[in-house]
């Protein structure tokens, strides 16, 4: 059980909807599993944090997958989450790292690239899917998710994401916020929000200082205005299994399975999301072949 969690809140009498997350241990779990280097850890961690909060907006068994592909050296960042605070992620090239940028920060933009898109696919149940995409406008990811909400979901939002990495590659702090303007919000409220966000300390610094998700929202929106609705735990969770990969092998067809038996005397599958390995004996593959006959 991690100490990570997300809070859902309203502010300014329901004119603003807000989410904030602490994801340090969740991102650490992903870093450990994928051996990511610092710049890759920051890019993956920011994406995981955003995806976890987007998952918190879902209901029941709904889930979503986010693919960030800016055509940069890191390749794709793929994360998925559900409404229960479970999130997982991987990157194509985990050993991606660059010198710090001019601001002295991890150069996430250089790793992610700026010539691609963010794609979001929501599985809302009953074989019903919603998908949206928007171009990457910054590569720093916070601005890119902000732009995604404005263009794909027509929801004016501000997304702040931060990950700090220790010299030994472990995660020092990770978290973020999504603040959304609801239909009918007063201009005065929007102006206050814009001013507060433009003047705030970077989110990773606030988390490093020990600010909780509640504290983050109080810092941005003002303690008097925030009404916390719910607090839910967040953790790295992968739903892969021996059986799921066996089904995937089944989908490869008879010829491919016969080849595995003849040449490899079995099979091994590795989960992209968590790195777990699953081994399949000749005997298991023969049983699988018989079921296809």
Curated annotation (Swiss-Prot):
After translation, the protein is modified as follows: Under oxidizing conditions two disulfide bonds are formed involving the reactive cysteines. Under reducing conditions zinc is bound to the reactive cysteines and the protein is inactive.
Q: Which Gene3D superfamilies match?
A: Hsp33 domain, HSP33 redox switch-like
Top-rank taxon, per record = Bacteria
Q: Which GO terms describe its biological process?
A: protein refolding
- Cystines in this chain: 238-240, 271-274
Q: Name one GO cellular component term.
A: cytoplasm
Q: Name one GO molecular function term.
A: unfolded protein binding
Q: Which keywords does this Swiss-Prot/TrEMBL entry list?
A: Chaperone, Cytoplasm, Disulfide bond, Redox-active center, Stress response, Zinc
Please give one Pfam family short name.
Answer: HSP33
Q: Which InterPro entries match?
A: Heat_shock_Hsp33, Heat_shock_Hsp33_C, Heat_shock_Hsp33_N
User: Where is it mainly found?
Assistant: cytoplasm
Location relative to the cell: Cytoplasm
What stretch or stretches form a coiled coil here?
none
Described purpose of this protein according to its UniProt entry: Redox regulated molecular chaperone. Protects both thermally unfolding and oxidatively damaged proteins from irreversible aggregation. Plays an important role in the bacterial defense system toward oxidative stress.
Family classification: Belongs to the HSP33 family.
Official protein name in the record: 33 kDa chaperonin
Q: Where does this protein come from, organism-wise?
A: Staphylococcus aureus (strain USA300 / TCH1516)
């Amino acid at each position: 059980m991690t100490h990570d969690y997300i809070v859902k809140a309203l502010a300014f009498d329901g004119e603003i909807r807000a989410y904030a997350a602490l994801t340090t241990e969740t991102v650490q779990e992903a870093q450990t599993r994928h051996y990511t280097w610092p710049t890759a850890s920051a890019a993956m961690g920011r994406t995981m944090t955003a995806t976890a909060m987007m998952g918190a907006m879902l209901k029941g068994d709904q889930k979503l997958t986010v693919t960030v592909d800016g055509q940069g050296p890191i390749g794709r960042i793929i994360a998925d989450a559900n409404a229960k605070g479970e999130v997982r992620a991987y990157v194509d090239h985990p050993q991606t790292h660059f010198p710090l940028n001019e601001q002295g920060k991890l150069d996430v933009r250089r790793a992610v690239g700026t010539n691609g898109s963010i794609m979001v696919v929501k599985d809302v149940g009953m074989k019903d899917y919603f998908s949206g995409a928007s171009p990457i406008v910054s590569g720093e990811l916070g601005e890119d998710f902000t732009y995604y909400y404005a263009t794909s979901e027509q929801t004016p939002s501000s997304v702040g994401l931060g990950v700090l990495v220790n010299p030994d590659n472990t995660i020092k702090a990770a978290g973020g916020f999504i603040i959304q303007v609801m239909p009918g919000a007063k201009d005065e409220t929007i102006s206050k929000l814009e001013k507060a966000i433009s003047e705030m300390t970077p989110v990773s610094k606030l988390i490093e200082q020990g600010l909780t998700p509640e504290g983050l929202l109080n810092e941005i929106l003002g303690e008097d205005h925030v009404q916390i609705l719910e607090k839910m735990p967040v953790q790295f969770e992968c739903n892969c299994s021996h059986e799921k990969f066996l089904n995937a092998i089944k989908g490869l067809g008879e010829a491919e399975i016969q080849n595995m038996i003849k040449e490899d005397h079995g099979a091994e599958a590795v989960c992209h999301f968590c790195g777990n390995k699953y081994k399949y004996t000749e005997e298991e593959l023969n049983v699988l072949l018989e079921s296809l006959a």
